[in-house]
């Protein structure tokens, strides 16, 4: 079973605020080559191209490719011009400089995690009253399909949250983008990957920063502490971490916040902060209703996942028998796919993590299936840490 979660008593959110958050709208990445990055998600992970912004749509300084699988939407944005040329494009000058600076400092990574809300003005004004650092005020973008309201605030590191209100828009994505309808030519040859939505999005912090960041989510966005574990629960022979899951008032949006803890060697959190050059999004968990099909088809498409040792499943079989828990899925199939299992008295969770998506050991993806289980796989953290430490050893960063 998973370690017990720490659930501090907090003041309840105001009833009027409980249903403000509708979920994750999209995740916005800054990357060196958006077209190639989009191709990765299309061919490796079964996403579809849904929208585009670039030279052909009148955007002369930046290009964005939008891909989607289920209700999971990624925007991948790259600069089209050098920093030296930025002054030639006054409308995009600040954005162009920001993207270049982000890529220089962090490499490819997540810039913005956008939330869909019922009323931007309400959530944004409350955040500002409570001390939010404003990146951009409430603004409206529109086209023939209606209008979208949005505003952006800063969170940890250089990451931001954009609040988006879509009630007045009937288009496929967002004004300023051209919709894409042609299926990728490879899709008819590759197995379909069915994903549902973003389950959670994890942020890594530097030493002793977790509590400050969690306090920020509580104060600025009205989030609460949903679940937590400390270094006694999440440790190996060499390293450890602490984690607190922050959730929106209605528990629709969940943002786990990690920080390193003392250990004999450098942990994966320290490695991330070192290579990312600061705090940022470590991984995005994508929910599926059939993880066996999803992992089977992702592997067939060439997605690389961590390897889980045989001993994990020997121990898990004993634990499941002791608990009297019978999985709906075939245990040997889960084992053959390296899928991790965690459970409590109410249900169970199945999960697996990709290897890092970039050469820098920073961002990766989690595939997750929940069966009446609201935790975050704390029972698997040791196995996950050990698997990542084996990768760290190969990179020479387990020091």
From Swiss-Prot:
GO molecular function: 4-hydroxyphenylpyruvate dioxygenase activity; metal ion binding
Cofactor: Fe cation
Binding residue positions for Fe cation: 200, 283, 366
UniProt keyword list: Dioxygenase, Iron, Metal-binding, Oxidoreductase, Phenylalanine catabolism, Repeat, Tyrosine catabolism
Keyword Cell membrane: no
GO term, biological process aspect, one: L-phenylalanine catabolic process
Cofactor note: Binds 1 Fe cation per subunit.
One Pfam assignment: Glyoxalase
Catalytic activity as recorded in UniProt: 3-(4-hydroxyphenyl)pyruvate + O2 = homogentisate + CO2
Protein family per UniProt: Belongs to the 4HPPD family.
The protein's name: 4-hydroxyphenylpyruvate dioxygenase
